[in-house]
Amino acid sequence: MMEEDLYDEFGNYIGPENEEDEEELFPQAPSPTIAQVPSFEEVIPDEELEDVERAEEMALSHLEPQNAVVLHEDKQYYPSAEEVYGSNVDIMVQEQDTQPLSQPIIEPIRHKRIAIETTNVPDTVYKKEFLFGLLTGTDDVRSFIVAGHLHHGKSALLDLLVYYTHPDTKPPKRRSLRYTDTHYLERERVMSIKSTPLTLAVSDMKGKTFAFQCIDTPGHVDFVDEVAAPMAISDGVVLVVDVIEGVMINTTRIIKHAILHDMPIVLVLNKVDRLILELRLPPNDAYHKLRHVIDEVNDNICQISKDLKYRVSPELGNVCFASCDLGYCFTLSSFAKLYIDRHGGIDVDLFSKRLWGDIYFDSKTRKFAKQSLDGSGVRSFVHFILEPLYKLHTLTISDEAEKLKKHLSSFQIYLKPKDYLLDPKPLLQLICASFFGFPVGFVNAVTRHIPSPRENAARKASQSYIGPINSSIGKAILEMSREESAPLVMHVTKLYNTVDANNFYAFARVYSGQVKKGQKVKVLGENYSLEDEEDMVVAHIAEICVPCARYRLHVDGAVAGMLVLLGGVDNSISKTATIVSDNLKDDPYIFRPIAHMSESVFKVAVEPHNPSELPKLLDGLRKTNKSYPLSITKVEESGEHTIFGTGEMYMDCLLYDLRTLYSEIEIRVSDPVARFCETAVDTSSIKCFSDTPNKKNRITMVVEPLEKGISNDIENGKVNINWPQKRISEFFQKNYDWDLLASRSIWAFGPDDRGTNILRDDTLSTDVDKNVLNSVKEYIKQGFQWGTREGPLCDETIRNVNFRLMDVVLAPEQIYRGGGQIIPTARRVCYSSFLTASPRLMEPVYMVEVHAPADSLPIIYDLLTRRRGHVLQDIPRPGSPLYLVRALIPVIDSCGFETDLRVHTQGQAMCQMVFDHWQVVPGDPLDKSIKPKPLEPARGSDLARDFLIKTRRRKGLVEDVSTTRYFDQEMIDSLKEAGVVLSL
């Protein structure tokens, strides 16, 4: 056979089988003889023979199936799970993926960091144990906030303290440290957004060490809630003012809030170097500029209180002069000490008292005088402080190194030769640090004029705690008892999120007792009361920290007087809370909610881009509500979620956190609008009545507008509904000339205890059984507060209205006059009487403060006129080339005003807007003859109707107010008989 026939075209062998070739390929090994194979008995002992036989049987049983025919479905290609993992492992088999497509099978490792936080505790010039000992064992503690206007140097002042207490801390090149600005958005925008607590140990002029628990607060006027929250648990205010800009709009509000809460003020005049290097004022003019700013602060204080204890003045020791950018802060005493340390021979206090005011120094006679004899005398402040300061600055920025070296040697300042080669600013910072050193003058001012927590305990208790002071809890708070047996009472005013933004720390002040890690406590919410204990949760303290801005000191416990961060108690807290121990003998009471300086009048609606992510949005809204004290979230009847804030900047930061930190989803945001209120401008045209559903009770009411000023007094806390009836009566008789009967008939404020509506009982005892009426008093109050919370026009709050209860007809049986009958009826009669009293809409108005050069004033006037705004005053700023313009602008027309202002003035103008008051929108909102035109702005008297229709549409309500919803048929017939025409 030919060789090519043995293979096919693919090279496969197809020839006949050859047994010889197969034997050559696979030769058979010779079988061993019996002599060659040893017996089992020789190799294996008798005791192991049984094991070997058993192993052979198992091996044979494993090999037997290899020669059997196995079906395809019975073949085993891989070992079973039991063979791989063992028989002790539970194995589950899932044939369908239970994870959604949006969730990866293997989750990536996410490091969500929203803030700068030091993982390792940095080195300090003091031991941490020493700091904790000061906080817990002594009264050498001061708790205060650092407040002021935007970019006036609050964070820089605390940076100055951080530089000297944290030796390893160095600022970035060509930038300030901003140690308390930990949020990434704060560092990106170069402005503080959140208040940040910082705890330090510092020494005064005598070397005594104090523990400072200071809180850096934002300066932007939109974030005044971050000022009010820590102020509620602080003992004083350090007010920072730029000497060139002077007292600004936010400074004024902070002063007012501090004086109303009886808090001492320490004034820091910052950026003194700008008078020398920028304005280049002569020393005598610089003195007048400094004095003018101090007088401006005192004028604002006097408008609130005439008490001299709040006055600030350098000779009193509560005014500091600083340039935080150059690294110095001094008082008259600390500067006088620099002279005495070099020359000696005089008392510091006596010398410092002669360094301010119209006191002159005669260099020839070396004596002080109250007036200059020849007219050429120099004030002592100018001679001893400003002139050396001017020399120090001017010589440093000049290139005369030898002259500077000679001048510095007179101050006993010796620098290295390479230091003279530095740029002017670093060189000036180095020289000022060598000359002034640690700001002991600032420490002295704070420790002398801001009381310790123990000294201030009685004042804080009287202002914040609503419980009885003569109880065991009240006495413990007054004494600031630190005993372990004392009742634990803490006040939470702020929530700070963790670095990953998943949880929150509760920022609290311990008023009495001791708190320990793992302790079981009761968390009482803002709505807690002895009658309604629903807003109370039992929790365990998971973590206790001493806040230090970028790091936290974890401790096992804290005592009364300390400000601490608490972990594990935030789940039930929305804004503020009271924390008490779970085994109190007396009934616990809560601390008052925070009285803020502004209102949330700016509103947007949000929704998720992907509707399936609504749960994430709701969770994010809950977290933003915790993080921002003045934010309010609400769900309208249309289902949309609305957020209320103070302004554009506030809302921008809140929405940034909502998108990137708390929900991590894409959201859609509506155009911003303003919040409205409802009011009445006339008395009800007829007595309005409403019957209960069972037709056995009738309530009659009349509405009239409140006198001007009452609403402001209620909101500012000048009158409180919880006062005794006699005290409330005396207040209205004295301030508003109410008669005795009217002033003693006040039942409630609405919609809450600080609401600007009043419910009065004007029924006569001859017509109404007062005992029966008192049995339904609480029901009528609830209906009144419900009605004033959600008005009939567009479901907004009613404001400045006096509701007078004229007549009540009640069923004699208690079962027929229960809450289910009286509450909705009281609400209906509030609405019907309100709608017959010329109802109107009210809109919020911003106070605008613009700083700009004189040539920008015409542009500012034009921009304000386009937005229904008007100028109140424009005045020049003393000692600066700027003008100050104060104006009013409606909130709904303010969107984009700041951007337009900067564009049209090429960035020369700077403005701040803050809520000022409510004003009535022109026009009748119920006038059906007005038809809003699409795509055209409403003008004049059409505004009210336009706002009403668009607001009701947005909320999912019908366009017009329904008559049958609020008026009984009998009431409608009575209106027709009286000739009253309702435009409903």
Curated annotation (Swiss-Prot):
One of its GO terms (cellular component) is U4/U6 x U5 tri-snRNP complex. It comes from the Eukaryota. InterPro entries: EFG_III/V, EFG_V-like, EFTu-like_2, EFTUD2_N, P-loop_NTPase, Ribosomal_Su5_D2-typ_SF, Ribsml_uS5_D2-typ_fold_subgr, Small_GTP-bd. The keyword Transmembrane does not apply. Disulfide bonds: none annotated. Residues 216-219 are annotated as: G3. SUPFAM superfamilies: EF-G C-terminal domain-like, P-loop containing nucleoside triphosphate hydrolases, Ribosomal protein S5 domain 2-like, Translation proteins. Residues 270-273 are annotated as: G4. It is found in: Cytoplasm; Nucleus. One of its GO terms (molecular function) is GTPase activity. One of its GO terms (biological process) is mRNA cis splicing, via spliceosome. Residues 139-402 form the tr-type G domain. Residues 1-28 are annotated as: Disordered. Keywords: Cytoplasm, GTP-binding, mRNA processing, mRNA splicing, Nucleotide-binding, Nucleus. The keyword Protein transport does not apply. GTP binds at residues 148-155, 216-220, 270-273. Residues 371-373 are annotated as: G5. Belongs to the 40S cdc5-associated complex (or cwf complex), a spliceosome sub-complex reminiscent of a late-stage spliceosome composed of the U2, U5 and U6 snRNAs and at least brr2, cdc5, cwf2/prp3, cwf3/syf1, cwf4/syf3, cwf5/ecm2, spp42/cwf6, cwf7/spf27, cwf8, cwf9, cwf10, cwf11, cwf12, prp45/cwf13, cwf14, cwf15, cwf16, cwf17, cwf18, cwf19, cwf20, cwf21, cwf22, cwf23, cwf24, cwf25, cwf26, cyp7/cwf27, cwf28, cwf29/ist3, lea1, msl1, prp5/cwf1, prp10, prp12/sap130, prp17, prp22, sap61, sap62, sap114, sap145, slu7, smb1, smd1, smd3, smf1, smg1 and syf2. Component of the U5 snRNP complex required for pre-mRNA splicing. Binds GTP. Belongs to the TRAFAC class translation factor GTPase superfamily. Classic translation factor GTPase family. EF-G/EF-2 subfamily. This is Pre-mRNA-splicing factor cwf10. It comes from Schizosaccharomyces pombe (strain 972 / ATCC 24843) (Fission yeast).
